Amino acid sequence: MAPKKPEPKKDDAKTAAPKAAPAPAAAPAAAPEPERPKEAEFDASKIKIEFTPEQIEEFKEAFQLFDRTPKGEMKITYGQCGDVLRALGQNPTQAEVLRVLGKPKQEELNSKMMDFETFLPMLQHISKNKDTGTYEDFVEGLRVFDKEGNGTVMGAELRHVLATLGERLTEDEVEKLMAGQEDSNGCINYEAFVKHIMAS
């Protein structure tokens, strides 16, 4: 008879005391927030004026309407710059206006003056860099507040958002904007609301 082969030993690890679990790795340090790219400073000398002479003449006439200097020196205050831009059909945010003005201090807005030659490159820059949202952008932004998914938002919530976020509107501005938009339940169809705003 052939000798018996020894049976393989069972894994001793199963019978031995379990090994201690390795210590958990230290939590990774929170990644620093990436730096926002710095906005390039506005440099009027690098702006190429592309308006026609006729357009420039029209702009000059509009600019002159805002001139409050005693001798009609063709100057406006920094604080009037946004108003003149908007009167000429542009729609810059207050932040954009302040950026092209070189981010003046609050007290400088009513004291510092600019002439038309200083203003024209600002107008050219703002008119070329229109970053206005599309209908879809606005609808998508309001859809966030559509809790029911039925195409409406609460009028009270929209009032609050318009008065407290981004470029805040005054109570009067909010009321004018929302006049006649709410249904009997205080809800607003936001697609119709965006069409109403964009048509204004």
UniProtKB/Swiss-Prot annotation:
Gene3D superfamilies: EF-hand
Signal peptide: none
Residues bearing PTM N,N,N-trimethylalanine: A2
GO MF term (any one): actin monomer binding
Subunit structure: Myosin is a hexamer of 2 heavy chains and 4 light chains.
Repeat recorded as keyword: yes
Cystine crosslinks: none
Stated role: Regulatory light chain of myosin. Does not bind calcium.
Residue span, EF-hand domain: 54-91, 133-168, 168-200
PTM sites of type Phosphothreonine: T93, T132, T134
Keyword ATP-binding assigned: no
Compositionally skewed regions (Low complexity) per UniProt: 15-32
Protein name, entry field: Myosin light chain 3
Recorded name of the encoding gene: Myl3
GO cellular component: A band; I band; myosin complex; myosin II complex
Residues bearing PTM Phosphotyrosine: Y135
One GO-annotated biological process of the protein: muscle contraction
Modified residues (Phosphoserine): S184
